[in-house]
Design a protein with these regions (language model features):
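Active-site adenylate/phosphate-handling loop in enzymes that bind or generate adenylated species
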Residues: 1-50, 120, 126-149
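Adenosyl-5′-phosphate
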Residues: 2-4, 53-254
Length: 254
């Protein structure tokens, strides 16, 4: 059985939430560099991990060209050092590695969408869809990943036709309005992200995460910092992806 998938649309035509923020670059550049650096550093040091908007504030640093794409990171430099306090000899240079993988382009949105296409789509999205489809005997095809569409998106479609401050995937929306009938259901698509935050509201999942992360004396992560993440999640902060990443690592390490 052959099925069609929509993978590639967000990466090619600017469908992620932070893509809209990148269109605000000219506005952000009005803020003096020293003020942006102070705001970025202060948010990293003083705001608790998982605090809404903390990652975005960290992105307002001196070099918007390289810092904004890093706003989606789960573990910033400060948190990594705290979690790996017993491994101080490690070179924790994830920011440098990611900066080097950002494609060279004068347009910031074009750089970020290319980075997502080369890294996130290839190393994450397509891996999951391929595994889930094959285990169910499906041959999945992604029309957006046709070479002609890829070339068209990156070579001919300007950023303002992909994303603005007020909207995303504008070109695709215009095309669907022209091609699909008025009575066609145009509700937003439903993603397949794991509802981690909802899961962690239940005692069973929270206890399981707690046991995996704090139930062993052999963990490489600082137990006090891990407990802060767990407590922060209970207080409504957004730490579910961080905790899930730590749990998956510990299970793999065992």
């Amino acid at each position: 059985t052959v099925a069609l998938g929509g993978d590639g649309g967000d990466e090619l035509f600017g469908g992620y939430g932070y893509d809209r923020l990148l269109r605000m670059q000219k506005i952000l550049n009005i803020i003096p560099k020293s003020a942006r650096v102070l705001l970025s550093k202060s948010s990293e040091i003083f705001l608790p991990v998982g605090f809404k908007g903390r990652n975005y504030l960290q992105g307002f640093s001196a070099d918007l060209q390289t810092s904004l794409p890093l706003m989606t990171s789960f573990f910033d430099r400060t948190l990594r050092k705290k979690l790996l306090s017993g491994w101080s000899s490690l070179a924790l240079n994830a920011e440098y590695i990611r900066e080097q993988r950002v494609p060279n382009h004068t347009d910031l949105l074009q750089r970020v969408t290319r980075m997502d296409f080369k890294n996130f789509l290839a190393d994450d999205i397509l891996v999951k869809t391929d595994r889930s489809s094959m285990i169910n005997s499906l041959e999945l095809r992604s029309p957006f990943l046709d070479q002609h569409i890829i070339d068209f998106s990156f070579k001919r479609v300007p950023s303002h036709m992909k994303t603005t401050v007020s909207g995303r995937k504008l070109l695709l929306q215009q095309l669907t309005t022209r091609l699909l009938p008025e009575n066609f259901d145009q509700k937003r698509k439903q993603g397949f992200s794991i509802p981690l935050a909802i899961w962690l509201q239940s005692a069973g999942w929270r206890d399981y995460f707690h046991d995996v992360l704090l139930g062993s004396d052999n963990s490489i992560f600082d137990s006090k910092e891990v407990k802060k993440l767990l407590d922060g999640q209970d207080k409504g902060r957004s730490n579910s992806e961080r905790l899930f990443s730590l749990v998956m690592f510990e299970l793999w390490r065992e």
